[in-house]
């Protein structure tokens, strides 16, 4: 489970939340417990409320087996946290072949930082919110030419799972077909070859140039929007039009406008950008969406 650091108000929240989680899960301890979504700002919150001290104490009392944190920031901030808190057993990172060379996500640099500190790695977003399933047609063709017996998603998850020091690869599955697909290639896992790894990184660089707005649809931005703008949905429509996956999304855009705030309603308060794990320039991107569809 995880301690929602960004939403803590007082130091006492940690103990209250933790014991509620134990009760709801019906367990006496957690195998893995992490501080949720640390970045340079949330790290200060964790320090302010003694979150590191608390989870270390819970580990000492046998209520947690391994402690760590999920992370969304640059490698230098990760290095700072791991240097100041060597007691951490693992770190959860966003790693996929699309973000491997990304200047904002810094998958490669963050992974190398965790390895330097000798930490186990838990990987989130291996298919980047579905972006590495719904790839451009030319990329899909290249993957099928490489091995037509494997799904598009399998390449992304195998890329993550092939890295050393990786303990777990988290995969969000929405149906049994996806579950069975994951089992098919992970049951007797075959790591990528060096050639395959290099090929996927090159594909990632290619895909990154084709994605207009690299949103993962995590929805962190939407709950606090004062204008009820469904930001990820608008970005998805914009990307599909730009990638020519569908040339006309006007009807869907109109439906969204009727049920939610529209991009032009944005008052530029910036709350969405403060919580975005991808560090997207959401305000300016909403203007792009409006220009495209209005």
Model-derived regions: residue spans:
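Structural motif corresponding to the early beta-alpha repeats
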Residues: 1-15, 36
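CE4/NodB-like, metal-dependent polysaccharide N-deacetylase domain
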Residues: 13-34, 56-61
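Beta/alpha (TIM)-barrel catalytic core signal, keyed to glycine-rich beta->alpha loops juxtaposed to Asp/Glu
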Residues: 35-216, 220-229, 233, 244, ...
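Cysteine-centered iron-sulfur cluster-binding motifs in ferredoxin-type domains/subunits
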Residues: 208-246, 255-279, 294
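Intrinsic disorder at enzyme termini
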Residues: 285-286
């Amino acid at each position: 489970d995880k301690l929602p650091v960004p939403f803590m108000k007082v130091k006492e929240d940690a103990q209250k939340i933790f014991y509620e989680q134990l009760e709801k899960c019906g367990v006496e301890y957690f195998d893995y417990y992490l501080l949720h979504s640390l970045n340079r700002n949330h790290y200060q919150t964790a320090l302010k409320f003694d979150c590191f001290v608390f989870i270390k104490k819970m580990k000492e009392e046998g209520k947690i087996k391994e402690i760590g944190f999920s992370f969304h920031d640059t490698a230098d901030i990760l290095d700072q946290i791991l240097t100041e808190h060597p007691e951490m057993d693992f770190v959860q990172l966003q790693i996929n072949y699309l973000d491997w060379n990304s200047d904002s996500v810094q998958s490669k640099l963050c992974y190398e930082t965790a390895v330097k500190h000798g930490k186990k790695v838990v990987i989130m977003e291996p298919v980047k919110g579905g972006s590495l399933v719904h790839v451009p047609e030319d990329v899909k063709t290249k993957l099928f030419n490489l091995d037509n017996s494997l799904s598009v998603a399998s390449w992304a998850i195998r890329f993550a799972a092939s890295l050393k020091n990786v303990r777990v690869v988290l995969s969000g599955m929405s149906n049994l077909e996806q579950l069975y697909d994951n089992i098919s290639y992970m049951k007797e896992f075959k790591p990528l070859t060096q050639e395959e790894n290099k090929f996927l990184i090159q594909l990632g660089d290619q895909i990154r140039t084709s994605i207009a707005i690299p949103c993962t649809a995590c929805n962190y931005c939407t709950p606090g929007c004062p204008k009820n703008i469904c930001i990820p949905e608008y970005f998805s429509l914009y990307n599909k039009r730009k990638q020519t996956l569908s040339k006309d999304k006007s009807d869907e855009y109109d439906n969204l406008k009727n049920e939610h705030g529209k991009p032009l309603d944005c008052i530029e308060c910036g709350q969405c950008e403060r919580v975005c794990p991808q560090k997207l320039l959401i305000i300016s991107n909403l203007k792009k969406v409006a220009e495209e569809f209005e």
